[in-house]
Amino acid sequence: MEVTAQLVKELRDRTGAGMLDCKKALEDTGGNIEEAITWLREKGITKAAKKSDRVAAEGLVGLVTKGDKQIIFEVNSETDFVAKNKQFKDLMATVGETLINNDPKTVEDVLKVSVNGEPLETVIVHAIATIGEKITLRRFKTVHLKTDQSLGVYLHSNNRIATVLIFSGKIDETIGKQLAMHVSAMRPQFISRDDISVDFLNSEKPILTAEAKNDPKNAGKPDNILEKMVEGRLNKQLAEISFLDQVFVVNPDQKISDVIKANNVNVVDMIRYEVGEGIEKEELDFASEVMAQVLK
């Protein structure tokens, strides 16, 4: 039986599976809709499709290295229960190995890479069917070190935060790790004040000005005094979000800029991943979260 666009659409409407999966299912079953549905179920694709609109904001971050290449990546699940289990950690290892042994530019690229004869995307679909939660490879970034560069890397013990720092010049491995650990803990948004955008400054100053004017303690103070207060608060805020301006957590007597200068290096790039950052997560109480696991 010919596999028509109408048949593919009907199968997609009934199962929620992707168009290509539906087409493949129909081709392998001679265009028989019911057999195609069974085919999709056996492959775990129907089950995965039903979870596609759920929020996956938990998971793990990982670091993999090969030669001059370093990759930081994040794989998400719906709950931290799943992120702690062996199957999920095995999947993390597979994703990391696939990333480091290939040269994908985008998530879409790496999902197409063959792993033991099937695309990584299919491997993830099988994991979804087995584990029972939505799982996604959210993002990754590849660093190719130049000969005059060095790295500072840190992966927190719970695998929820990771940082990669790239330096021009050679830095001691321990100090590089300590600086990466600092970034993981203190969350600087920019390397230096020079990197802070004009848009950020233009959005922050009016907020600080309004806060100062609305503070009862500032009632009656002239505008020039309020302006100086706002500038002081803005400078303090910029120091808090600028890596080089921050106080070094390992040695509070030093600023990060002092450590960088003492080691004769410059910070070229700063990459910090934290699981789920920027994802709007559905709030569940603990009992509801447990029941959600039971009812999967």
Swiss-Prot record:
Function: Associates with the EF-Tu.GDP complex and induces the exchange of GDP to GTP. It remains bound to the aminoacyl-tRNA.EF-Tu.GTP complex up to the GTP hydrolysis stage on the ribosome.
Compartments where located: Cytoplasm
GO MF annotations in UniProt: translation elongation factor activity
Gene3D superfamilies: 1.10.286.20, DNA helicase RuvA subunit, C-terminal domain, Elongation factor Ts, dimerisation domain
The keyword Cytoplasm appears for this protein: yes
CDD domains referenced in this protein's UniProt entry, alphabetically: UBA_EF-Ts
Protein name: Elongation factor Ts
Residue segments, region Involved in Mg(2+) ion dislocation from EF-Tu: 79-82
Family as reported in the entry's similarity comment: Belongs to the EF-Ts family.
Example of a GO cellular component annotation carried by this entry: cytoplasm
Keywords from the named record: Cytoplasm, Elongation factor, Protein biosynthesis
